Amino acid sequence: MSKYTILDKINTPSDLKLIPESQLKILSAELRAFLVDTLDVSGGHFASSLGATELTVALHYVYNAPYDNIVWDVGHQTYIHKILTGRKDKLVTIKKDGGISGFPKRSESEYDTFGVGHSSTSISAALGMAIADRLQGKSSNTVAVIGDGAITGGMAFEALNHAGGIKEDILVILNDNEMSISDNVGGLSAHFSKIISGGFYNSIREKGKEVLKNIPPIFEFVKKVETQTKGMFVPANFFEDLGFYYVGPIDGHDVTELVKTLRILKDHKGPKLLHVITKKGKGYTKAESDPIKFHHVAPSFHSGENVITKASKPTYSNIFGDWICQKAAKDKRLVGITPAMKEGSDLIRFSQLYPHRYFDVAIAEQHAVTFAGGLACQGLKPVVAIYSTFLQRAYDQVIHDIALQNLDVLYAVDRAGLVGADGATHDGSFDLAFMRCIPNHVIMTPSDENEAYHMLELGYEYNGPAMVRYPRGAGIGAEITDSLDLELGKAKIVKQGSKIAILNFGTLLPLAKQLAEKYHATVIDMRFVKPLDEIMLDKVSQTHEIILTLEENCIAGGAGSAVNEYFVAKDLSNKIIVRNFGLQDKFLNHGTKDLLLAQSKLCVENISQELDKLI
């Protein structure tokens, strides 16, 4: 007999609505158990979905998705949503090649109303949907679910300001898993919130306001008392000042209370914000104790059959973490900045050793970059540790605030290139293209860990903005040396061959060496995208017939394009054959990195096919 007696009956939200409300608590427990069992096989984002279980059940119980729009922010918390919307049996394939995505994806399900992976987008998207439906005469409801971390992003505030200003009918649910209210106040707050969210209070409050508006002094007094009274029990919030009807905080794990509150708010028109308190990792003791560790789990995390051992080779993030700690010990001007990526960027040790020189600015990439600019203006040396995919979000600041003023800011760009299982939303496919066109920048592409370490050093000492990009995961195990023959804008000949020259940008150097063995080709580690080693390009063009460029970045506008531009400017394009190999002009699905590289023709077999046609 199945242990999922209720869950087995549910494949869609329509099935969920047939379940008696009294059984929703049991269903929530079954969903958690199913999530544990499934991710023990597949791995995936874990703690966030555990924390949002009751909220997800209540949303699909009250609202009529997909007619009603439920928009999720970031997407880490949507595994329960996927289970309840026809993908229960596919959850074991999550983030695998040919399997379902780890994030909401419009092409995957009609219930995934808006594709996501980055944060702070939900309210903007939901507002657009609400207005579009209203303009087309559709009577749907629209809900945005956003976490207390994501709501710190500036885009979320912009959307709140817009929605409140135009009084659009939209519900924003703030999923707060940081427990910002102390326990002794929390009980009173929950009690008071039940009164505030009650239908009777709603009715009296709105009708009373209409009457009291005719007596301005009394109206202002009552309004002030209500605001001050709520302020005694809830965090000082500005949501009502933005035009939102604020309700909460309420217990995000009380599914009965959630259903009751959502039903009331569904009938309340205008912009509304429901503040729910949840616990990340709820229902799994280890995840509750260490939600960061259990944010994402590997297969067998629960059964323990395959214990994951620590990688024998350090990751590129580890190399950065070591470098910044060592450099900070020598230079008191160094400050480290990250937009909510302390663990991923390996800044934990730095934050512990130098807490007054470490700044986690939360999910605020634009602020992170301009903040670094302000630090640089006053003589400090800021290092911005940021993922490639998130650097995109601060593009104007990179240009206007840093490059235009030629400020000393070092960008340590992690997760450059393909990231694998997280897919297109997290791939670092474009940074070479969008950074290369900006004046005053130095752009470095290390081929191994040792180059990465010394390029960070070179970029730090450079007078102006500099960027070092490196991939996710471990390198080749290169030893970190005390010194390296590394000169600004100078490439390195790795292997001398003839006829064919392979210009490598970044960590595809092993691929270049494999091709060189097969074709007796010259291999050059270009190291710098900007400035290019033009002397090396001149030499190569004079001594070789075919030139290949390799990069784990989009071909359009990337390092290969820079080489093409140089050869065209020198009138050499008709004298040599140049072929660029990089990421194709399309978004890739999730999968293993080797598979995605092969799909991008970045493998010996595919490049050999092209070369054989040219020889």
UniProtKB/Swiss-Prot annotation:
<dbReference type="InterPro" id="IPR009014">
    <property type="entry name" value="Transketo_C/PFOR_II"/>
</dbReference>
<feature type="binding site">
    <location>
        <position position="76"/>
    </location>
    <ligand>
        <name>thiamine diphosphate</name>
    </ligand>
</feature>
<dbReference type="GO" id="GO:0009228">
    <property type="term" value="P:thiamine biosynthetic process"/>
</dbReference>
<dbReference type="GO" id="GO:0052865">
    <property type="term" value="P:1-deoxy-D-xylulose 5-phosphate biosynthetic process"/>
</dbReference>
<protein>
    <recommendedName>
        <fullName>1-deoxy-D-xylulose-5-phosphate synthase</fullName>
        <ecNumber>2.2.1.7</ecNumber>
    </recommendedName>
</protein>
<dbReference type="Pfam" id="PF13292">
    <property type="entry name" value="DXP_synthase_N"/>
</dbReference>
<dbReference type="Pfam" id="PF02780">
    <property type="entry name" value="Transketolase_C"/>
</dbReference>
<comment type="function">
    <text>Catalyzes the acyloin condensation reaction between C atoms 2 and 3 of pyruvate and glyceraldehyde 3-phosphate to yield 1-deoxy-D-xylulose-5-phosphate (DXP).</text>
</comment>
<dbReference type="InterPro" id="IPR049557">
    <property type="entry name" value="Transketolase_CS"/>
</dbReference>
<dbReference type="GO" id="GO:0008661">
    <property type="term" value="F:1-deoxy-D-xylulose-5-phosphate synthase activity"/>
</dbReference>
<comment type="similarity">
    <text>Belongs to the transketolase family. DXPS subfamily.</text>
</comment>
<dbReference type="InterPro" id="IPR020826">
    <property type="entry name" value="Transketolase_BS"/>
</dbReference>
<dbReference type="Pfam" id="PF02779">
    <property type="entry name" value="Transket_pyr"/>
</dbReference>
<dbReference type="GO" id="GO:0000287">
    <property type="term" value="F:magnesium ion binding"/>
</dbReference>
<feature type="binding site">
    <location>
        <position position="365"/>
    </location>
    <ligand>
        <name>thiamine diphosphate</name>
    </ligand>
</feature>
<keyword id="KW-0784">Thiamine biosynthesis</keyword>
<dbReference type="InterPro" id="IPR005475">
    <property type="entry name" value="Transketolase-like_Pyr-bd"/>
</dbReference>
<keyword id="KW-0414">Isoprene biosynthesis</keyword>
<dbReference type="InterPro" id="IPR029061">
    <property type="entry name" value="THDP-binding"/>
</dbReference>
<comment type="pathway">
    <text>Metabolic intermediate biosynthesis; 1-deoxy-D-xylulose 5-phosphate biosynthesis; 1-deoxy-D-xylulose 5-phosphate from D-glyceraldehyde 3-phosphate and pyruvate: step 1/1.</text>
</comment>
<keyword id="KW-0460">Magnesium</keyword>
<dbReference type="GO" id="GO:0019288">
    <property type="term" value="P:isopentenyl diphosphate biosynthetic process, methylerythritol 4-phosphate pathway"/>
</dbReference>
<feature type="binding site">
    <location>
        <begin position="117"/>
        <end position="119"/>
    </location>
    <ligand>
        <name>thiamine diphosphate</name>
    </ligand>
</feature>
<keyword id="KW-0808">Transferase</keyword>
<feature type="binding site">
    <location>
        <position position="148"/>
    </location>
    <ligand>
        <name>Mg(2+)</name>
    </ligand>
</feature>
<comment type="subunit">
    <text>Homodimer.</text>
</comment>
<feature type="binding site">
    <location>
        <position position="177"/>
    </location>
    <ligand>
        <name>Mg(2+)</name>
    </ligand>
</feature>
<dbReference type="InterPro" id="IPR033248">
    <property type="entry name" value="Transketolase_C"/>
</dbReference>
<dbReference type="GO" id="GO:0005829">
    <property type="term" value="C:cytosol"/>
</dbReference>
<feature type="binding site">
    <location>
        <begin position="149"/>
        <end position="150"/>
    </location>
    <ligand>
        <name>thiamine diphosphate</name>
    </ligand>
</feature>
<dbReference type="GO" id="GO:0030976">
    <property type="term" value="F:thiamine pyrophosphate binding"/>
</dbReference>
<dbReference type="GO" id="GO:0016114">
    <property type="term" value="P:terpenoid biosynthetic process"/>
</dbReference>
<keyword id="KW-0479">Metal-binding</keyword>
<dbReference type="InterPro" id="IPR005477">
    <property type="entry name" value="Dxylulose-5-P_synthase"/>
</dbReference>
<keyword id="KW-0786">Thiamine pyrophosphate</keyword>
<feature type="binding site">
    <location>
        <position position="177"/>
    </location>
    <ligand>
        <name>thiamine diphosphate</name>
    </ligand>
</feature>
<feature type="binding site">
    <location>
        <position position="284"/>
    </location>
    <ligand>
        <name>thiamine diphosphate</name>
    </ligand>
</feature>
